């Protein structure tokens, strides 16, 4: 099926985000769903990955969710969920909606996971782009995917821009994107 003519009626996480936001009167950027622990039931099976993520974060918030090789960096489910909420709110603020595409282009780093899951929580499709691709191949990847937002490291911004694809937003995880050279 085509990029927007999907066979799915809604991306899996969209339903959960609406439920989470409206049913609990939760603002993505300001409310801690972990404080609603008693309202959630754990006897029902989650129906989406986003629901499973939120449920896990609520059930065992202090457990380690992510650990880098060697254990130099860790992230608890509480911190992971908080970062996912901030990312989802930020992407929503940029106008990212259900069906949009967010491309992630960075070296291996723990920040990748909240970015990826945060995009899914607003109903976007997120995917990782090989950071070794030349601009010509990025042109195909971004254009074919209909990329609206690229989240990357500063070192990749020039290559993203050189792709020539009209990307609405470039977000750098390690600072502001360098100004366009004229």
From Swiss-Prot:
SUPFAM superfamilies: Acetyl-CoA synthetase-like (SSF56801)
InterPro entries on file: AMP-dep_synth/lig_dom, ANL_N_sf, ATP-dep_AMP-bd_enzyme
Pfam families according to UniProt: AMP-binding
PANTHER family linked to this entry: LONG-CHAIN-FATTY-ACID--COA LIGASE (PTHR43767), NONRIBOSOMAL PEPTIDE SYNTHASE PES1 (EUROFUNG)-RELATED (PTHR43767:SF1)
Protein name: Uncharacterized protein MT1599.1
Species of the source: Mycobacterium tuberculosis (strain CDC 1551 / Oshkosh)
Upper lineage: Bacteria, Bacillati, Actinomycetota, Actinomycetes, Mycobacteriales
């Amino acid at each position: 099926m085509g990029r927007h003519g999907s066979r799915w009626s809604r991306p899996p996480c969209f339903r959960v985000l609406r439920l989470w936001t409206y049913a609990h009167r939760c603002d993505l950027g300001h409310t801690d769903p972990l404080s609603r622990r008693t309202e959630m039931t754990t006897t029902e099976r989650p129906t989406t990955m986003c629901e499973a993520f939120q449920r896990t974060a609520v059930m065992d918030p202090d457990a380690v969710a992510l650990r880098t090789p060697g254990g130099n960096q860790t992230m608890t489910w509480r911190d992971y969920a908080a970062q996912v909420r901030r990312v989802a709110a930020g992407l929503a603020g940029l106008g990212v909606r259900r069906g949009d595409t967010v491309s992630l282009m960075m070296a291996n780093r723990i920040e990748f996971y909240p970015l990826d899951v945060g995009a899914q929580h607003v109903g976007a499709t997120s995917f990782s782009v090989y950071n070794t691709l030349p601009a010509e191949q990025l042109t195909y990847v971004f254009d074919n995917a209909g990329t609206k937002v690229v989240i990357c490291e500063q070192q990749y911004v020039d290559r993203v821009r050189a792709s020539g694809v009209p990307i609405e937003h470039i977000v750098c995880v390690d600072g502001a994107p360098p100004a366009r050279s004229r």
